[in-house]
Amino acid sequence: MAEEEEAKTEANGQQQAPQMRVLGQFIRDMSFENIMAQKGAPSDAQPDVQVQVNLDAKKRTADNQYESAIKLNVTSKVKDGDATLFVLELDYVGIFHVDNVPDEQLHPFLLIECPRMIFPFLRRIVSDITRDGGFPPLNLENIDFLSLYRNELARRQSSEAPKMDA
């Protein structure tokens, strides 16, 4: 155990900086439904786009390798109406080699830093899919993964808190 700690420190006693390498990234699952074309909705309809983001991370079998996934659900509906234009579901995964991250910081690292690294590629895929589906390219805004992580932690803590009876 002490040998592992010594290996993690440099000669000057400082802890080594966290290191991350992207080993690969891929689309695990994708679905695009062009409901407008199926139902013949007017093409000049003003869209109201709703985006839902979920994150997931898990350890892989190889040492120091982790999987971080961004699960995106995009629904575009007609503004001032309830007709759906399109639905896009995308599960995008990055495989990472992570070193020098303390165990207590690993979970936030995998759900904040890793998604931040692969998000630009996911954004391009979403833009291409919507364009190829007959719509203007959907350019997603940047996602604040730190806020998303904090909000999820707060939601889980509030749902696990014991309820007081009067």
From Swiss-Prot:
Signal peptide: none
UniProt protein name: Protein-export protein SecB
Assembly, per entry: Homotetramer, a dimer of dimers. One homotetramer interacts with 1 SecA dimer.
GO biological process: protein folding; protein tetramerization; protein transport
Cellular compartments annotated: Cytoplasm
Its biological purpose: One of the proteins required for the normal export of preproteins out of the cell cytoplasm. It is a molecular chaperone that binds to a subset of precursor proteins, maintaining them in a translocation-competent state. It also specifically binds to its receptor SecA.
Similarity annotation: Belongs to the SecB family.
Alphabetized UniProt keyword annotations: Chaperone, Cytoplasm, Protein transport, Translocation, Transport
Disulfide bond positions: none
GO (cellular component) term, any one: cytoplasm
HAMAP family in the cross-refs: SecB (MF_00821)
GO molecular function term, any single one: unfolded protein binding
